């Protein structure tokens, strides 16, 4: 900090002489703080419940029967197989992306559960999960976990523009969801 310089007696007298006849201005301006909108936060209890639900659905012991030939795909029994075809063709473009690179299996399960919960909360029906090539651990496990979740309607190996065989496009069941009209 700079030291305050003191004025000499002469300078102080000169200042008083120059300021004679002036009066102090009264500050009457009121400054209003801008009103900020409250951002609706997801309650902590709900987040904890979503995480618990996510870990509940993904089991390592249960192995759903998935087709091992050709690209990785799955369609829930009550969903039309045409939805998988639309995923394959790229008719659906994902709105949320999840990159699992570098995560452990436990972290990947938690992130998958969080992605599905976020999709349902935000009414996003298509997401992309990038599991990568790596050591093939997450590449093998990710489809098995997704097939176990009741809100996953279908998934298919992603088209090249979304990651090809290192990613999956996932169709999530959202409340009041209707497939979009094709042009």
UniProtKB/Swiss-Prot annotation:
It comes from the Bacteria. GO terms for molecular function: RNA endonuclease activity; rRNA binding. Its EC number is 3.1.-.-. Residues 98-173 form the Smr domain. Keywords: Endonuclease, Hydrolase, Nuclease, RNA-binding, rRNA-binding. Gene3D superfamilies: 3.30.1370.110. It is an enzyme of class 3 (hydrolase). GO terms for biological process: rescue of stalled ribosome. It holds the Pfam family Smr. Belongs to the SmrB family. Associates with collided ribosomes, but not with correctly translating polysomes. Acts as a ribosome collision sensor. Detects stalled/collided disomes (pairs of ribosomes where the leading ribosome is stalled and a second ribosome has collided with it) and endonucleolytically cleaves mRNA at the 5' boundary of the stalled ribosome. Stalled/collided disomes form a new interface (primarily via the 30S subunits) that binds SmrB. Cleaved mRNA becomes available for tmRNA ligation, leading to ribosomal subunit dissociation and rescue of stalled ribosomes. HAMAP family: SmrB. This is Ribosome rescue factor SmrB. It comes from Escherichia coli (strain SMS-3-5 / SECEC). The gene is smrB.
